[in-house]
C-alpha cells in the first residue's frame, strides 16, 4: 500500500476531527487539553506497534531455529538410512545359508506338536466313545472338555501343516480323516444343547442348573470362535467347523420354541365354536404373560447380561404372534371377528393386560412396534367397514320392504303413547349405536369412518323409503278403496321421519368429533332426506282431506254459497274428522300439519274468492264481506278448538279478512289501502286484485287495474314482509281477464 497515500488520508482525517472539536469559540480554551489527549493516544499506539513488531521478530527467530534443527535431523536420518541399506545388502546371503536351519526348525515344531498330542492321536476312538458316553449321561461340561481336547489336537496338527512352505493336500486329508469322528461328537453335543434349550422355560422352573451348564458351554465355544477368526486374520488358517456360532443357534432354538408354543395354543376352529377367535386370543394372552414372567424372573439371572434375554424373548413372541395373527387374517375373518382381532391388537396386546402389565412393563410402540403392519391393520379396518356396510345394506333393504308390505295390510299401526309408529327407526339406530360402541373400543378414527358410512347408508335407506312413500301415495289415489289404513300409515311415516331426524342428531352428539368438518354434508343430506319425507307425507295427509272437500270448495262464492253455510260447515266437519286421526301425530308433526292445513285452507278459500264466480253490486258486497269475515273467524275458531296449545297468531287465515275488507272500501281511496297491503304482501299481483274486484260489478276492471298500477308504482319496499306472502305466489290462474 502507498505510504504517502496513507499519510494523506490520516492528515485529512485529523483535519476533520479538529474541525469537529473546534466548532464553537469556547472550545479554543480546550486546545491544550485536546493536544495532550491526542499525544497520549499516539504514544499508546506507538507502544502497541513496537510490541507487535517485537512479537513478530521473536516468532521469526524461533522459526529459524526450528528450521535449523530440522535440517540437522534430516542429515542424521539420511546417514542412518545409508548405514541400514549397507547392512541389508548381506541379508540374502545369510537367508540362503540358514535354509537348513529353517527346515530343521519346522520338523522340530511338528515333532513337538505330535509329541504333545500323542495321547489323542493314538486314542481318538477311545476319546470319542468316552465323550459320547458323557453326553448320554448328561455330563455335558466333562463331555465338552473332552471334545475341546480332541479339537485342539486336530487344530494344532493342521496348523503345523498349514505353516509348511510346501503344503500337501494328501497330508491334510489324512489328518482330517483320522479326526473325522470329532465332528460327529460336536454335532451330538449340539443336538443335546438344542434339546435342552428348546425346553428352557420348563427346565428353568425345575432345574435351572441344566440351562446354566448349557450356557457355559456355549460361551466357551463363542470365545473359541472369536480366537479362531482372529487367528485367521493373522495366519490365514481357520480350523474345520469354525465358527460354530452356537449363540446364534441358541437364539434360533428359542425363537422356534416360541413359535411352536404360539401355534400349539389353538384349541378350536370356527366350525367348533363361534367364539373361537376370542378364546384363542385370550389363551395366547395368558400364555405369553406367564411365559414372559418366567423369562424375567428366571431367565434373566441365568443368561449372560449381554444376551439381553428378556428383550430377545419379547421380540420372539412379538414376531411369532405377528406372523400367527397375519395368517389368521389372510385366511379370512367373519362378523365380530374383525372387531375382536383389531381390539386385541390395538389395546389388549400393548395394554396393561399383556405387554404393559406391571410385571413386564414393555413399551411396545417404542421398543418393538405394532403387532400388525399399519397397511395390514388398515386393510383389516377397510374389510370390517365393507362387511358392516353390506350388513347395513341387506338389513335396511329388508326393513324398507317390510315397511312397504305393512302399509298394504289391514292392521292398524302400533302405538306408543297414542302416536302411530313402527320400530324401524329405533332398530336402525340401535344397530348403528352397537357398531359404533364396538369401534370405539378400537380407536376414534375407525368410529368416525363407521359413523360416516352409517349415515350414508341411512340416507340411502331414506331415498328408498321416499320412493316407496311416493309409490304408496300414487297407488292410493288411483283407487282410494284399496288401502284401508292409508291415513294411519302416512301418519306413521311422518312420525318415523321425525324420529329418524331426532335419532340422527342424538347420534351426532354422541359420536361426531367437534373438530371434524369433513363429510358433514353427508349428515346434512340425511337430515334433508327425512325432512323431505316428513314434508311429503304431511302433504299427502292434507291432500287426501282436501280431495274430499273439493266439491265444497267449488261451491264457495256461488249463489248456493250465498244462500247457505253448508259448504263451510261440511269443510269444518270433514277437517274435524280427519284431525281425529291426526291426533296420532307427534306434537311437532301435529303442529306442522295444523300450520300447513291453515295455509292450504286459506289458499283454497282465497282461490275460490278470486275465481270470478260472483258479481254483485256495491250494496250487496257489504253482506258478502261480512259473510267472508264470519267464515274466516269460524275457521280460526275451529283450529283453536282442535289445537288449543298451538299459537294461531299471524295465521294465514287472517288474509281472508284482509282481502274481504277491500270489497267494502271506497274506490276513490283504494290506492291508499293498496299501499300498505302491497308493502306487506309483494307477491299480491294485479291479476289477483282485479279478480277480487270482479265481485263488485260497479267497478270496471280497467279502473281497478289503473289504481293497482298506481299503487304499485308508488309503493315503498317495507323492511318486514309478512311470512304468509308466499300464499299469493302459489295462487296462479291460467285464464286471463283481459
Curated annotation (Swiss-Prot):
The keyword ATP-binding does not apply. One of its GO terms (molecular function) is SNARE binding. The keyword Protein transport applies. Residues 28-91 form a coiled coil. GO terms for cellular component: cytoplasm; exocyst; membrane; presynapse; rhabdomere; zonula adherens. InterPro entries: EXOC3/Sec6, EXOC3/Sec6_C. It comes from the Eukaryota. Keywords: Coiled coil, Exocytosis, Protein transport, Transport. The exocyst complex is composed of Sec3/Exoc1, Sec5/Exoc2, Sec6/Exoc3, Sec8/Exoc4, Sec10/Exoc5, Sec15/Exoc6, Exo70/Exoc7 and Exo84/Exoc8. This is Exocyst complex component 3. The gene is Sec6.
Amino acid at each position: 500500500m502507498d505510504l504517502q497515500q496513507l499519510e494523506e488520508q490520516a492528515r485529512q482525517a485529523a483535519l476533520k476531527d479538529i474541525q469537529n472539536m473546534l466548532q464553537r469559540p469556547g472550545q479554543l480554551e480546550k486546545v491544550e487539553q485536546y493536544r495532550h489527549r491526542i499525544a497520549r493516544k499516539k504514544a499508546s499506539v506507538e507502544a502497541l506497534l513496537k510490541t507487535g513488531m517485537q512479537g513478530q521478530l521473536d516468532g521469526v527467530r524461533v522459526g529459524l531455529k526450528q528450521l535449523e534443527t530440522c535440517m540437522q535431523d534430516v542429515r542424521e536420518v539420511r546417514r542412518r538410512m545409508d548405514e541400514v541399506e549397507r547392512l541389508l545388502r548381506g541379508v540374502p546371503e545369510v537367508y540362503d545359508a540358514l535354509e537348513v536351519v529353517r527346515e530343521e526348525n519346522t520338523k522340530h515344531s511338528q515333532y513337538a506338536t505330535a509329541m504333545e498330542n500323542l495321547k489323542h492321536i493314538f486314542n481318538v476312538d477311545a476319546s470319542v466313545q468316552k465323550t459320547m458316553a458323557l453326553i448320554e449321561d448328561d455330563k455335558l461340561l466333562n463331555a465338552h472338555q473332552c471334545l475341546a481336547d480332541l479339537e485342539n489336537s486336530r487344530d494344532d496338527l493342521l496348523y503345523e501343516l498349514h505353516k509348511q512352505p510346501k503344503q500337501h493336500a494328501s497330508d491334510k486329508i489324512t489328518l482330517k480323516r483320522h479326526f473325522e469322528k470329532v465332528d460327529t461328537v460336536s454335532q451330538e453335543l449340539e443336538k443335546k444343547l438344542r434339546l435342552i434349550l428348546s425346553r428352557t422355560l420348563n427346565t428353568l422352573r425345575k432345574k435351572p442348573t441344566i440351562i446354566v451348564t448349557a450356557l457355559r458351554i456355549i460361551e466357551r465355544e463363542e470365545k473359541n470362535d472369536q480366537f479362531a477368526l482372529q487367528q485367521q486374520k493373522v495366519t490365514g488358517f481357520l480350523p474345520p467347523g469354525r465358527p460354530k456360532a452356537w449363540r446364534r443357534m441358541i437364539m434360533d432354538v428359542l425363537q422356534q420354541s416360541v413359535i411352536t408354543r404360539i401355534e400349539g395354543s389353538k384349541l378350536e376352529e370356527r366350525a367348533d365354536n363361534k367364539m373361537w377367535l376370542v378364546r384363542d386370543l385370550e389363551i395366547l394372552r395368558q400364555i405369553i404373560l406367564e411365559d414372559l414372567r418366567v423369562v424375567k424372573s428366571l431367565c434373566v439371572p441365568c443368561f449372560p447380561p449381554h444376551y439381553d434375554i428378556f428383550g430377545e424373548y419379547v421380540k420372539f413372541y412379538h414376531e411369532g404372534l405377528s406372523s400367527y395373527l397375519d395368517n389368521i387374517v389372510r385366511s379370512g375373518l367373519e362378523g365380530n371377528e374383525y372387531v375382536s382381532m383389531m381390539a386385541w391388537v390395538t389395546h389388549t396386546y400393548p395394554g396393561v393386560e399383556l405387554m404393559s402389565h406391571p410385571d413386564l412393563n414393555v413399551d411396545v410402540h417404542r421398543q418393538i412396534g405394532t403387532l400388525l403392519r399399519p397397511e395390514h391393520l388398515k386393510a383389516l379396518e377397510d374389510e370390517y367397514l365393507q362387511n358392516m356396510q353390506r350388513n347395513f345394506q341387506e338389513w335396511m333393504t329388508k326393513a324398507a320392504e317390510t315397511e312397504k308390505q305393512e302399509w298394504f295390510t289391514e292392521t292398524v299401526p302400533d302405538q306408543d303413547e297414542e302416536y302411530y309408529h313402527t320400530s324401524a327407526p329405533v332398530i336402525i339406530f340401535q344397530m348403528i349405536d352397537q357398531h359404533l360402541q364396538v369401534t370405539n373400543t378400537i380407536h376414534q378414527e375407525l368410529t368416525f369412518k363407521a359413523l360416516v358410512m352409517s349415515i350414508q347408508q341411512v340416507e340411502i335407506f331414506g331415498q328408498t323409503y321416499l320412493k316407496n312413500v311416493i309409490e304408496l301415495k300414487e297407488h292410493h289415489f288411483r283407487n282410494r278403496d284399496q288401502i284401508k289404513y292409508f291415513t294411519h300409515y302416512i301418519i306413521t311415516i311422518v312420525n318415523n321421519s321425525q324420529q329418524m331426524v331426532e335419532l340422527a342428531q342424538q347420534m351426532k352428539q354422541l359420536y361426531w368429533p367437534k373438530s371434524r368438518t369433513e363429510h358433514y354434508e353427508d349428515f346434512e343430506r340425511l337430515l334433508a332426506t327425512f325432512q323431505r319425507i316428513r314434508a311429503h307425507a304431511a302433504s299427502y295427509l292434507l291432500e287426501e282431506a282436501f280431495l274430499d272437500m273439493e266439491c265444497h270448495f267449488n261451491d264457495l262464492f256461488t249463489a248456493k254459497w250465498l244462500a247457505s253455510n253448508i259448504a263451510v260447515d261440511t269443510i269444518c266437519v270433514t277437517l274435524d274428522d280427519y284431525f281425529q286421526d291426526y291426533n296420532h301425530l307427534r306434537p311437532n308433526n301435529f303442529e306442522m300439519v295444523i300450520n300447513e292445513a291453515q295455509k292450504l285452507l286459506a289458499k283454497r278459500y282465497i282461490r275460490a274468492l278470486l275465481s270470478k264466480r260472483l258479481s254483485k253490486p256495491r250494496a250487496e258486497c257489504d253482506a258478502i264481506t261480512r259473510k267472508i269475515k264470519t267464515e274466516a273467524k269460524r275457521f280460526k275458531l275451529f283450529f283453536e278448538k282442535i289445537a288449543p296449545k298451538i299459537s294461531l297468531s299471524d295465521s294465514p287465515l287472517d288474509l281472508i279478512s284482509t282481502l274481504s275488507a277491500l270489497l267494502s272500501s271506497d274506490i276513490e281511496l283504494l290506492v291508499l289501502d293498496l299501499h300498505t297491503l302491497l308493502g306487506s304482501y309483494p307477491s299480491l299481483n294485479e291479476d289477483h286484485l282485479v279478480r277480487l274486484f270482479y265481485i263488485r260489478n260497479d267497478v270496471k276492471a280497467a279502473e281497478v287495474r289503473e289504481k293497482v298500477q298506481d299503487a304499485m308504482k308508488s309503493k315503498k319496499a317495507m323492511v318486514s314482509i309478512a311470512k304468509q306472502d308466499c300464499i299469493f305466489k302459489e295462487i296462479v290462474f291460467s285464464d286471463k281477464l283481459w
